[in-house]
């Protein structure tokens, strides 16, 4: 029997410009990010970062760290939103690069964007 619960608990992106990316994920994608500094000597995730943790239901932590080398590129992450039309307008106003606007999916509506480092961010509104 494994000690691993096989459940995602953290997503971390290393970004080229932490201030710019923090503003995009906060203002454009609606995440309540908090800036802090881990000075624990960890070469992978030490240093300045902006993060949010969801604690209702299953715990999940999302963080942006200033890249110490090449930033994370080509990853994809998705967030649930209450109103996709409003979220879409907010994402574009904050500088997200549009991949596709809101489209109907079997589970609701979704739209996709690229962040400043080329990662894909999907915003999804559940079907009523």
Task: Please annotate each region the language model reported.
Residues 12-14, 78-82:
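Short hydrophobic/aromatic beta-strand micro-patches
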Residues 44, 61, 78, 99, ...:
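Short hydrophobic/aromatic beta-strand element in the GNAT-like acyltransferase core
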Residues 5-6, 12-59:
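Core segments of cupin and vicinal oxygen chelate
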Residues 24, 85-90:
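Short amphipathic alpha-helices within nucleic acid-binding modules
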Residues 39-43, 72-73, 105-109:
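Short acidic/glycine-enriched loop/turn segments that link adjacent beta-strands
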Residues 8-10, 73-77:
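Eukaryotic phosphotyrosine signaling hubs
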